[in-house]
Amino acid sequence: LAHPIQLRKQNRAQLRNEIKNLADMGLDAIEVIHSDHRESVVVMLDEWADRFGLLKTGGSDFHGSNKLHIKLGFAQSRRRIPRSYFDAIVARLRKRHLSRDVLNPSASESIVINSHC
């Protein structure tokens, strides 16, 4: 779920309930770090991601030279997106892929993940 704060709920309780409902329906991840998120929002979303079993993502919202104050790979020009976010996504993808192979041993599809970031 990108830009979860933009769901524009009236308060944090409503936002939390909406994110929980989405997680219950199969949501995989939530954008915890974003260039518009204050530290208190990052902490809140991080806690909710843990509580609801969601992967964590982050982004700078970099869209090129039209936003000079935003740097690629950094949120708020000082916070880097943790490598652990990427590693957790890769681990879940590998687990799903392995589960698929166990359920369907004849599956010929493969997953290739380049971890040279």
Show where each model-derived region lies.
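Charged catalytic cores and adjacent phosphate/nucleic-acid-binding surfaces used
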Residues: 1-117
